């Protein structure tokens, strides 16, 4: 889908660049496949802010997207492509031959009327799902499982994908968009193709109000706060903060390693940080 610009009737319209969604379904989602979604304004169950600068925004219904694709060897027809406010990618409504409906992540080049299927050995075409170990080397995939049966976790955002670059016994070597290469068990499933809406990276919000519609509140820098509010705060006049950049809680930011799951380090063959060190 192409990008859409607007006549500069206002400053917000002048800057605005959006994805053309005219080809998507314009009605409401399937009610049985949606759930209510409470807005928490970045607060947790105790009422404390856990994510700053969140709140407001348009009311949204959560679409129940099938990331597991456990209905094996049953063909499904793509009924329509839809917008989903909860994610950057588009979703597709599919209808199985037995009448059951489900939402899936829509890959690129998937069209209304296409047939998709999940199984051990299926055609390598967008939307089909099979175990990574049965796919040929070089295949572009998305919605990749990390644990067998858990459902897809990797490459789910708009335009993202991973590529199978090799095999190692029961595992396959997967290269991510970030440059990271890691081992994933061959029995983990993945969907073929790249995720839809690759132009999402090129949009321009245009004005602050549109960010508010998305539930994003103004982001304040630490150097303009008081010392009680942030380690960078205070000082007479404008300052540079006076120390290496830190979070409001004093922890180093900008480059500090935060990964703590050492038990899965053995599955990462090439770190995504390796390119930065060159």
UniProtKB/Swiss-Prot annotation:
Part of the 50S ribosomal subunit. Forms a bridge to the 30S subunit in the 70S ribosome. The gene is rplB. Pfam families: Ribosomal_L2, Ribosomal_L2_C. Transmembrane segments: none annotated. One of the primary rRNA binding proteins. Required for association of the 30S and 50S subunits to form the 70S ribosome, for tRNA binding and peptide bond formation. It has been suggested to have peptidyltransferase activity; this is somewhat controversial. Makes several contacts with the 16S rRNA in the 70S ribosome. One of its GO terms (biological process) is cytoplasmic translation. Residues 222-278 are annotated as: Disordered. The keyword rRNA-binding applies. Keywords: Ribonucleoprotein, Ribosomal protein, RNA-binding, rRNA-binding. PROSITE patterns: RIBOSOMAL_L2. It comes from the Bacteria. The keyword rRNA-binding applies. The initiator methionine may be removed. One of its GO terms (molecular function) is rRNA binding. InterPro entries: NA-bd_OB-fold (IPR012340), Rib_uL2_dom2 (IPR014722), Ribosomal_uL2 (IPR002171), Ribosomal_uL2_bac/org-type (IPR005880), Ribosomal_uL2_C (IPR022669), Ribosomal_uL2_CS (IPR022671), Ribosomal_uL2_dom3 (IPR014726), Ribosomal_uL2_RNA-bd_dom (IPR022666). This is Large ribosomal subunit protein uL2.
């Amino acid at each position: 889908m192409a990008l859409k610009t607007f006549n500069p009737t206002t400053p917000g319209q002048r800057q605005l660049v959006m994805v053309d969604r005219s080809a998507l379904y314009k009605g409401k989602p399937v009610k049985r496949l949606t759930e209510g979604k409470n807005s928490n304004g970045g607060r947790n169950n105790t009422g404390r802010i856990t994510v700053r600068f969140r709140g407001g925004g348009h009311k949204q219904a959560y679409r129940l997207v099938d990331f597991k694709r456990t209905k094996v060897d049953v063909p499904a027809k793509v009924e329509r492509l839809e917008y989903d406010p909860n994610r950057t990618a588009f979703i597709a409504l599919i209808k199985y031959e037995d009448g059951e409906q489900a939402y899936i992540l829509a890959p690129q080049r998937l069209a209304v009327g296409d047939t998709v299927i999940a199984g051990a050995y299926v055609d390598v075409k967008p939307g089909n799902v099979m175990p990574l170990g049965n796919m040929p080397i070089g295949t572009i995939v998305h919605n990749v499982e990390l644990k067998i049966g858990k459902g897809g976790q990797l490459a789910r955002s708009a335009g993202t994908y991973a590529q199978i670059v090799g095999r190692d016994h029961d595992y396959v070597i997967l290269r991510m968009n970030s440059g990271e290469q890691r081992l994933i068990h061959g029995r983990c499933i993945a969907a073929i193709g790249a995720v839809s809406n690759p132009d999402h990276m090129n949009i321009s919000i245009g004005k602050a109000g549109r960010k508010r519609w998305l539930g994003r509140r103004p982001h304040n820098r630490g150097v303009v706060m008081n010392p009680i509010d942030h380690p960078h705060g205070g000082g007479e006049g404008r300052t540079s903060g006076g120390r290496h950049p830190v979070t409001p809680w004093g922890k180093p930011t900008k480059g500090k390693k935060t990964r703590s799951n050492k038990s899965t380090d053995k599955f990462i063959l090439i770190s995504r940080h390796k390119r930065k060190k060159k």
